[in-house]
């Protein structure tokens, strides 16, 4: 620690070895994975934290398999035994400020993965071959802002989170960019033994290679009652909407697709919850010391 600056350095070693049955060729690789964290405290109300790490990603056994699988009369899935492990570089920056009932958190990150193993589709005669290869690179820029206020009158708390993910996927035979905006809102109200909770979030989508994997857009409303060790509640998913969907897309030039999965039954789907806290053995009451001669709290708050 240097004045208000805390730092942490780490390093690890990874060994990857692969040998396919019936094949004399094998693959072995070592990688050094460093990690660093810097944390600067401006005051009791704010700090700035920077993190960076390098780690190794290895191909899965299914991707390495040379076996061909027939999907249908036009498509074949084929593994690639020549896949190589690759390095991943990630850095992120977080700024946090809080004062009284107000709290804010601003976060940004950048991911860079050269030679990333990603999907691709090739045309061979009258067939479409789906396989994997070490592509040029995959990059992701992310940003997120969280605002929270509460508790107001010791009863109400509100929070809002908005963010964006920008993907850049560069293959050997393709190049795609995709931007996904998302938000999440929460509200909770507590009065005596009752509590009311509401949450809404939009789709958080992921893009890798040529494939878009969609997240969920969902709302939830629930009310709970607590009496001693008993807690009971009733709630509903999507109580005000019926537009739940999960999308999936592939942007390949030979065999693209776009699907949207709708579940109308998720609209106004009710749930009931009961829980009881059982306690066994002795129970002890603890009191906080008024004077603490040591200070081990770095005021680190981890948000994922």
Stretches with model-predicted labels:
Residues 1-304:
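Exposed, low-structure sequence patches enriched in small/polar residues
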